[in-house]
A protein has these predicted regions:
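Flavin-dependent oxidoreductases
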Residues: 10, 20-22, 26, 161-236
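Helical element adjacent to the flavin cofactor pocket in flavoenzyme catalytic cores
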Residues: 118-120, 124-186, 190, 194
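Dinucleotide-binding Rossmann-like beta1-alpha1 core, especially the glycine-rich loop
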Residues: 7-109, 113
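Short hydrophobic/aromatic beta-strand or adjacent loop that forms the aromatic wall/cage
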Residues: 49, 122-124, 211-215
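Glycine-rich FAD pyrophosphate-binding loop
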Residues: 1-2
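Short amphipathic alpha-helical/adjacent loop interface patches that line ligand
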Residues: 6, 27-28, 146, 195
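Alpha-helical scaffold segments in soluble metabolic enzymes
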Residues: 30, 64, 141, 148, ...
């Protein structure tokens, strides 16, 4: 959802199947196209996701996860044994970013490039086609483009979907106490935690569940974590 979003994106997904990787690769292609067209008004970057561990067994799991991701289409795995071969992510922008992932198991290389993480780390996995953006800015940009092309924003509650022969024929909305039916052949459900409820209006029982996430913000007056750092996960 975008309500309390971390405003990050990734093509780094496990199987089974390549559905999520393929979906996100296509979505990232579209975001990058919009970023180019808008002079990157929504600040898309590709700093990556960084997974770190102090557990040698987890380092082996990193390698397996990266190999699986490569097989699913997330890009190649590069095992960095020479620090000169590691290419740090750009702090801004996305056009020169790598895909795939870099696995580093040399502590000296880790300390050079990521001096701000736990010095006990024995491995880091830097997934590359990942990053962050201003989701609100992107939303406003897309809304403006939609209006330029004749689209309208209409605020209402979806209370029903009419179908015939297995196809959508109209949507039923409620706004300010009025019930409105709009005929349409298509409906796009982008309802986040309400996806299962909305799909039920179509007679579809989606196998999805709402998972609670808790976000905590901590002040960093000493700038222990650089502003240009990747999104960091301590895997232990």
């Amino acid at each position: 959802t975008s309500d309390k979003s971390t405003e990050c994106y990734r093509n780094w997904w496990p199987g089974p199947g390549d559905d999520m990787v393929a979906l996100m690769n296509r979505s990232i292609d579209l975001m990058e196209s919009h970023a180019k067209d808008s002079d990157n008004v929504f600040l898309l970057n590709r700093r990556g996701y960084l997974f770190a561990t102090a557990n040698p067994e987890m380092a082996d799991k990193f390698a397996l996860q990266a190999s699986e991701a490569e097989s699913l289409g997330a890009g190649p795995l590069r095992h960095i044994t020479n620090g000169a071969l590691y290419r740090p992510a750009s702090a801004h922008g996305f056009e020169n970013g790598l895909d795939g992932a870099d696995l580093i198991t040399d502590k000296d290389i880790i300390n050079v490039h990521f001096p701000y993480i736990n010095p006990e780390a024995v491995a880091v996995l830097h997934a590359r086609r990942c990053g962050s953006l201003s989701a609100q800015q992107m939303g406003m940009y897309l809304l403006e483009r939609t209006r330029e092309n004749g689209g309208e924003l209409f605020s209402a509650e979806l209370i029903g979907v009419e179908t015939s022969a297995g196809r959508v024929t109209s949507v039923v909305l409620e706004a300010a106490g009025d019930v409105i039916e709009i005929r349409t052949d298509n409906i796009v459900l982008s309802t986040g935690p309400y996806m299962k409820v909305c799909a039920a209006l179509l007679g579809i029982d989606l196998p999805v569940a709402v998972e609670k996430h808790i976000k905590i913000s901590l002040s960093d007056p000493y700038r222990a974590i650089p502003r240009e750092a990747p999104l960091i996960f301590w895997a232990d």
